[in-house]
Regions:
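A local structural motif
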Residues: 12, 63-79, 83, 90-93, ...
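Secondary-structure end/capping motifs
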Residues: 143-218
Length: 237
């Protein structure tokens, strides 16, 4: 999405940090028929994120495992993860692609749900890049005018990420307080699987550019039709 926005704004935004690595899972209700990507062939898959990371990652992984996402499976897209979980509740033997923390929340509400596949692990089997789910962006005009503010933000951001990953109780309480999840208990259980990071500078460029190259090679539309230029990656002067 960030790469597409970069194209649509004629380079008007910059990525300042990778904030989330892989958080996508295949969840199965009431069975254990899905043990590998190959087991998805012929099935209906509920998913969020049409036109964003979940769609592109799922399609890439299906193709990499010899499954045509347009012919060999039926993918039903929903705008929100909560819609997917609601549909699963009303569908026997449902299969869905969900991100954390919704995987954890859904599992706590329905003990017949199980994590069938960790899509980060599936990605690692077929790609030589990190699976990236989210980046933090800034308007290029603002970053050029206020580089010190951006640098200060990133320093505070790194501290916040460290706290989120080490102080689970405090972070979980904040998640409930700010309405990120309904209950702190859900957040505390989900946080270790949320892959929250703060990758900046050379690490940001190396990981994000390699990931975008994989998406571009699979489908140029996934990154807005062209790979972003070097100016997409913000670095401190």
């Amino acid at each position: 999405l960030a790469a597409t926005l970069y194209q649509k704004t004629n380079g008007g935004i910059q990525a300042v940090a990778v904030n989330t690595l892989g958080v996508l899972y295949v969840v199965e209700k009431g069975g254990d028929t899905v043990q590998s990507m190959a087991d998805l062939k012929g099935r209906t898959i509920l998913s969020t994120g049409k036109g964003t990371t979940p769609e592109y990652v799922l399609r890439y992984l299906l193709n990499a495992n010899g499954i045509d996402p347009d012919k060999d499976v039926t993918i039903e897209y929903y705008s929100e993860a909560t819609e997917v979980t609601a549909q699963m509740a009303n569908t026997d033997n449902a299969i869905a692609v969900l991100p954390q923390p919704y995987v954890t929340a859904a599992g706590l509400q329905d003990d017949t749900l199980r994590v069938a596949l960790n899509l980060t692990e599936e990605w690692d089997k077929v790609a030589d890049t990190q699976l990236i789910t989210g980046v933090t962006v800034v308007r290029k005009e603002y970053a050029e005018a206020h580089p010190d503010v951006v640098a200060a933000f990133l320093a505070d951001y790194a501290k916040s990420v460290d706290a989120a990953n080490t102080d689970l109780d405090g972070t979980a309480a904040l998640c409930e307080e700010q309405g990120v999840v309904a209950k702190a208990a859900i957040a505390k259980k989900a946080l270790p699987n949320c892959n929250i990071v703060c990758l900046t500078g050379d690490e940001l460029k190396a990981d994000a550019s390699a990931y975008l190259q994989v998406l571009y090679d699979a489908d140029p539309a996934a990154v807005g039709g062209a790979l972003p230029g070097d100016d997409f990656y913000w670095t401190a002067e």
